[in-house]
From Swiss-Prot:
Residues modified as N6-(pyridoxal phosphate)lysine: K249
One Pfam family in the UniProt entry: Aminotran_1_2
Enzyme class, broadest EC rank: transferase
List of residues binding pyridoxal 5'-phosphate: Y72, S108, K109, Y132, N187, Y218, S246, F247, S248, R257, N292
This protein's name: LL-diaminopimelate aminotransferase
Keyword field contains Transferase: yes
Binding locations of substrate: Y15, G42, K109, Y132, N187, N292, R388
HAMAP family according to UniProt: DapL_aminotrans_1
Job of this protein: Involved in the synthesis of meso-diaminopimelate (m-DAP or DL-DAP), required for both lysine and peptidoglycan biosynthesis. Catalyzes the direct conversion of tetrahydrodipicolinate to LL-diaminopimelate.
Provenance organism: Prochlorococcus marinus (strain MIT 9515)
Top-level taxonomy: Bacteria, Bacillati, Cyanobacteriota, Cyanophyceae, Synechococcales
Gene: dapL
Amino acid sequence: MVQINENYLKLKAGYLFPEISKRVNSYTQANQGSEVIKLGIGDVTEPLPNACINAMSKALNEMGTHEGFKGYGPEQGYEWLREKISKNDFISRGCQITPEEIFVSDGSKCDSSNILDILGHDNLIAVTDPVYPVYVDSNVMTGRTGETLKNGTYQGLLYLAINEDNNFLPEIPKNKVDIVYLCFPNNPTGATITKDELKKWVDYANHNKSLILFDAAYEAFIQDKDVPHSIYEIDGAKSCAIEFRSFSKNAGFTGVRCAYTVIPKCLTGQNSKGDKVDLWPLWNRRQCTKFNGVSYVVQKGAEAVYSSQGKKEVNSLIDFYMENAKIMRNKLRSAGFTVYGGCNAPYVWIKVPADMTSWDFFDHLLEKANVVGTPGSGFGLAGEGYFRLSAFNSRLNVSNAMERIINI
């Protein structure tokens, strides 16, 4: 009989968001007619920008002609899109990232997991706690951790607690780690990092020859001018960091699927003999073998994000969601909740009442207010006692949800 990958058996009972869906479905089936407002999963709700729709429609029509038809595209992405990304997202901020260092993909969730394909199994890995679950689960699936401990953590991972005491910023490890995942603006806490704090991480990584996997999926929501949008704004980052970006949240591409990963040409690892090995060719080889590229139509939609109309419409979407976050933050604070985040990220991170766990509060909001959020403990041990609410919803739903919560 075929042998399975037993690492999957180490995973917790269910991925966080399917578990939430399971509980919500159970509640709605038992309470027919309940109008549940979902502020849990960070999925967008507003329509795509017209600039993107028009560009994709034009591209689709092109595909219906012999002259305009496109088959397999380049695995790295079309050069015209990578040039726009390089110019608008990096060169404009003083980051010398070339189009050749950009790999277009169908999602940063996929890339942050798939990057492990080119990294060895013996690396010591650090993650923040709480953390986006994909970072942990993908390492478990590929056998890079030990067994599950009683507290829900995994042997072999170094957990860096982020909480009120350290302003939700992880402390630099005292010892060497090989790989560290950083996400800023942070999911789930909504916290940001300053250039000075990020420089400490870059210096640490270069000193220890470590690799930073930097998730910048929410950079477009940054409002403060002194908050870095890219790790490459920091001197020395190109020699120690890979950055993940996405069109999902800023341009509403969660159902369209387009993202990109930056791997600088100067970034290196080493083999078992201690010889330096460039990471760019390894990732390029991986993509050429396992990925057929993002469709021409979708990439044309992504290119339109950088048009003058596209920029205006994307900014309008971001302003809409950030106004939602402001409403949530202000309403919850007026009701006596301690609230973090929501200033440079589309998430608010609230402390739950002292007599409740995160899942207790989840059930409380679901049953008493018909509002769904995400229990902080689902993001890690240090998330216990907190709760995440997403600003990705309609203005009416956000306003109604806040009124329901404060009137419980």
